UniProtKB/Swiss-Prot annotation:
Pfam families: DUF4682, RabGAP-TBC. Residues 380-406, 603-647, 731-766 are annotated as: Disordered. Residues 393-404 have a biased composition (Acidic residues). GO terms for molecular function: GTPase activator activity; small GTPase binding. GO terms for biological process: negative regulation of cilium assembly. This is TBC1 domain family member 30. GO terms for cellular component: ciliary basal body; cytosol; nuclear body; plasma membrane. It comes from the Eukaryota. The modification Phosphoserine is found at residue 642. May act as a GTPase-activating protein for Rab family protein(s). It comes from Mus musculus.
Length: 766
């Protein structure tokens, strides 16, 4: 339709020229040129025929003509088409993007066939493993629906190959989080062609976007975020002031925290993904068309247009939390409900300022070379201009020293408040010493006068005051917290002392004679493992001992010796000797072991825990009174038995005790008493258990009947399989008398077992 209107206007101009008469060839050419100049620059070059003075070979095509001039004409024409409300048609987009990418690759003299073989080879490079892991993590988070779900597995494989190919192409950038979203949209436009998608990614990241946009800790991205805040303050001053107010309020309410600029959270995501995660797909493609032709400043323009559209609802927010909640809701509405119309958005983008954006290059240069996270204090404004230039250059050249001082102050914790003035004084001396050398060096202000504006000192003063206030508040908060913790610990310590001093001391137990070890409260309720270190430091007070104390002996060694299988077998064998002589009782070793009482076992364990040194001490019943003297023997009376002397002499002859025990005879009354219910009494270990410990003086106690501890089964003969007891044989009494069976004796079996036991023991002794 535009072509018909334009052709009709030209025909009417030709008829007017005919009515005016022949004015010569010059008049005709001048009129034609005037008509051509009236053609809007926002419309593409069209096919014009049947007019005198117009080149009939001038045609508009999707492919540029040969030569640099032909490409420039094609570029200008497509740039004008991109500015239209309809934008570049969907059918043209793939061809247009590929033409731009091919021209860039040709300009840098790239052999594309060789590049394809290198980037898409099947062999794994050393750097592919780490990048491949991160790529796979991000594949499932790709926002495009065509790459989600199990049915899109093949599409994700293609996406991974494209991302890995670009990482191989540009190793300085590698893979950055967010590339998966860019590559997914490019693959959608390229209809899944891997090579074409790689071309577009190379052109977009290496040519269109600023250098180091995705490398060097996203430095160029940080620069654009700072530039955007200045542009927001310039174009939307009311909204910018409102956001600054919310930020200051949040800083005051946080109690020493620091609230970043409120726009950073959203603009960073917009810049990294080029609005692919916050706007509909058709709007994003129009924005990308403009980015390919106009450059990266379109990103800043679109961000300003979005904030201008959302400004009315944002100005109603009264707190930073309310702002974040509102922006979360608006972002979802922009993506799903077309809150922003694409033609209105692009019209705002192109009409807000002429191209290129005024002061954009200066602002980028300023923040690129003057990003100081912790700048030095600004001196008074009465200093001369030359001195001010030197200060600016010093701020730019020395951020590392300032960061080092800031980190050193922050790492000192509560003491940083005392050392901060000294560090600042030291920093000031260093700067004054290097001031003359800095005056002679080159200055960024001399290289680019527009990079440093007139309000630089005010800006730095405000920024320094904010950072110093934040740092001081943090230190004061740490001091207060440290003092509260220290005071609380002191109060708890006083409470422990008060509770320990309550009530008179009535009695002192032997376990309280020594100071108890410190136990972590987290280990309460768990069984404490006894080590040799604790046993070595322990001293036991024994009333019956002559000295009142027993020297510490390693508990684990004594316990191991007493519970060894061979010593258990010897003890059982010694018990069987009197029974063998009298031909009474059961000769089965297993039956004797089963008859041992559980109460004796419990009391034995209690005695071992109470006396960890492993010594056998004099046992006192609950009804006994007083402590015996160290030299004599203390009688012990048990209900139902006659008093038995307990030898308390430390120099007792162990061999004599063994002879007496071996000569001890057990009668029929003792065997019958085993089947009756027995009363368990606290018992001590037999003196023979300690008889084999060489070089030690021990206190022996006479063994009570039925009070031996339960010991494991042991056979001196080597056996592949251990002896197993049959339940039927036990019920028949083959293993000795039990509660279910009468007291039946087998003399022949007992003789055989005893003879074999005696023979084995004698052989073992040899």
């Amino acid at each position: 339709m535009r072509q018909d209107k334009l052709t009709g206007s030209l025909r009417r101009g030709g008829r007017c020229l005919k009515r005016q008469g022949g004015g010569g060839v010059g008049t005709i050419l001048s009129n034609v040129l005037k008509k051509r100049s009236c053609i809007s620059r926002t419309a593409p070059r069209l096919l014009c025929t049947l007019e005198p003075g117009v080149d009939t070979k001038l045609k508009f095509t999707l492919e540029p003509s040969l030569g640099q001039n032909g490409f420039q004409q094609w570029y200008d024409a497509l740039k004008a088409v991109a500015r239209l409300s309809t934008g570049i048609p969907k059918e043209w987009r793939r061809k247009v993007w590929l033409t731009l990418a091919d021209h860039y690759l040709h300009s840098i003299a790239i052999d594309w066939d060789k590049t394809m073989r290198f980037t898409f080879n099947e062999r794994s490079n050393p750097d592919d493993d780490s990048m491949g892991i991160q790529i796979v993590k991000d594949l499932h988070r790709t926002g495009c629906s065509s790459y989600c779900g199990q049915e899109a597995e093949q599409d994700r494989v293609v996406l991974k190959r494209v991302l890995l190919a670009y990482a191989r192409w540009n190793k300085n950038v590698g893979y950055c989080q967010g590339f998966n979203i860019l590559a997914a949209l490019i693959l959608e436009v390229m209809e899944g062609n891997e090579g074409d998608a790689l071309k577009i990614m190379i052109y977009l990241i290496d040519k269109v976007l600023p250098e180091s946009y995705f490398v060097n800790n996203l430095r160029a991205l940080s620069v654009d975020m700072a530039v955007f805040r200045d542009l927001l303050r310039l174009k939307l001053p009311e909204l910018s002031q409102h956001l600054d107010t919310l930020q200051r309020t949040a800083n005051k309410e946080s109690g020493g925290g620091y609230e970043p600029p409120l726009t950073n959270v959203f603009t960073m995501q917009w810049f990294l993904t080029l609005f692919a995660t916050c706007l509909p797909n058709h709007t994003v493609l129009k924005i990308w068309d403009s980015v390919f032709f106009e450059g990266s400043e379109i990103i800043l323009r679109v961000s300003l247009a979005i904030w201008a559209k959302l400004g009315e609802q944002i100005e109603c927010c009264e707190t930073a939390d309310e702002f974040y909640g509102t922006m979360g809701r608006l972002t979802q509405e922009m993506l799903e409900q077309d809150l922003l119309q694409s033609h209105e958005l692009m019209q705002t983008v192109y009409s807000m300022a002429p191209f290129p954006f005024p002061q954009l290059a200066e602002l980028r240069e300023k923040y690129t070379y003057n990003i100081t996270p912790f700048p030095a204090t600004i001196k008074p404004t009465s200093v001369s201009g030359r001195h001010s230039k030197a200060r600016d250059s010093d701020d730019e050249n020395g951020p590392d020293d300032e960061d080092a001082v800031a980190s050193a102050v922050g790492c000192l914790g509560p003491l940083s408040g005392l050392l901060a003035p000294e560090l600042q004084k030291y920093q000031k001396q260093i700067k004054e010493a290097t001031e003359e050398q800095t005056l002679r060096s080159n200055n960024i202000a001399e290289l680019s006068p527009g990079a440093i504006n007139s309000c630089r000192s005010e800006y730095h003063a405000a920024f320094n005051s904010m950072m110093m206030e934040r740092m001081t508040t943090d230190i004061n908060a740490l001091k207060r917290q440290y003092s509260r913790i220290k005071k609380k610990q002191q109060q708890q310590l006083h409470q422990v002392y008060i509770r320990a001093d309550k009530g008179p001391v009535t009695s002192i137990l032997p376990s309280q004679a020594n100071s108890s070890p410190v136990i972590n409260h987290l280990l309460l309720g768990k069984k404490m493992k006894i080590t040799n270190r604790a046993a070595k430091n322990a001293v036991i007070h024994v009333p019956g001992h002559p000295g009142g104390k027993i020297s510490p002996v390693p508990y684990e060694d004594i316990k191991t010796k007493l519970n060894s299988p061979w010593r258990t077998h010897i003890r059982v064998h010694k018990k069987n000797m009197p029974r063998t002589k009298s031909h009474l009782g059961c000769g089965d070793t297993v039956g004797l072991i089963e008859e041992q009482s559980e109460g004796c076992k419990a009391s034995s364990l209690g005695a071992a825990e109470e006396f960890p040194s492993g010594r056998t001490v004099t046992a006192h019943s609950e009804g006994s009174s007083g402590d015996g003297d160290g030299g004599g023997s203390t009688p012990r009376t048990i209900e139902g038995q006659s008093p038995e002397p307990v030898f308390g002499d430390a120099d007792v002859d162990v061999a004599a005790v063994q002879v007496k025990l071996e000569a001890l005879e057990l009668n029929q009354r003792d065997a019958a008493a085993e089947t009756e219910p027995k009363v368990h009494f606290p018992c001590q270990r037999h003196a023979s258990e300690l008889a084999d410990a060489p070089g030690e003086n021990q206190t022996a106690i006479k063994l009570l009947p039925g009070s031996t501890s339960k010991t494991p089964i042991f056979s001196p003969f080597p056996s592949v399989k251990p002896l197993r007891k049959s339940a039927t044989a036990r019920n028949l009494g083959l293993y000795g008398p039990t509660e279910r069976t009468p007291n039946v004796h087998f003399p022949q079996m007992s003789r055989g077992f005893n003879k074999s036991g005696i023979g084995n023991s004698s052989t073992k002794k040899r």
